[in-house]
């Protein structure tokens, strides 16, 4: 017989299952403890947004580090743009961001149902696909082309913060 060995992929798989099924209040407590110990304490004005966003932040997360990384865009006041990603913001992407912001100003309630028609309209008018709209918006809102779904990002940030981030000078 061979000796037993530590299988990290199996442990991470079990941890992912545990994170998906755990009570979100308990998960939030664990996340705040983790951040306080290993990262930086979550600011009190951001805690409510993080707590409400755990439903989607924990998707595909295998560790508390993954949840922290997925929610980093909520925790920061100023976005640090990934330089490789900011290069993707060309003139067409700037137009998409500007057009989205114009239409976004007109909506009162943030939900997938109110955001989807705006995105679909931008896809048509800019003769592009979802990536052509979603990617520039994700970069503008989070500083990276990777992250949660675009509707989740917008809803979690709230109208005021989204407008502030979409009008960032770097994107002009």
Which ranges hold each PLM region?
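Structural motif
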Residues: 1-7, 44-50, 124-132, 145
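Charged substrate- and nucleic-acid-binding regions of tRNA-handling and nucleotidyl-transfer enzymes
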Residues: 113-172
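Non-catalytic, well-ordered alpha-helical scaffold segments
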Residues: 8-12, 25, 51, 55, ...
């Amino acid at each position: 017989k061979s000796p037993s060995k530590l299988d990290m992929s199996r442990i991470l798989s079990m941890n992912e299952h545990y994170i998906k099924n755990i009570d979100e209040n308990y998960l939030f407590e664990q996340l705040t403890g983790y951040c306080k110990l290993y990262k930086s304490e979550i600011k009190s004005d951001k805690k409510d947004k993080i707590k409400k966003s755990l439903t989607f932040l924990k998707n595909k997360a295998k560790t508390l580090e993954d949840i922290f990384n997925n929610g980093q865009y909520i925790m920061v006041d100023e976005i640090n743009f990934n330089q490789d990603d900011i290069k993707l913001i060309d003139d067409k992407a700037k137009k998409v961001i500007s057009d989205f912001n114009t239409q976004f100003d007109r909506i009162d309630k943030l939900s997938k149902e109110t955001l989807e028609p705006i995105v679909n309209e931008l896809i048509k008018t800019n003769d592009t696909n979802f990536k052509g709209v979603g990617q520039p918006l994700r970069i503008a809102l989070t500083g990276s082309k990777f992250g949660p779904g675009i509707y989740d990002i917008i809803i979690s940030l709230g109208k005021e913060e989204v407008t502030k981030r979409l009008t960032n000078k770097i994107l002009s």
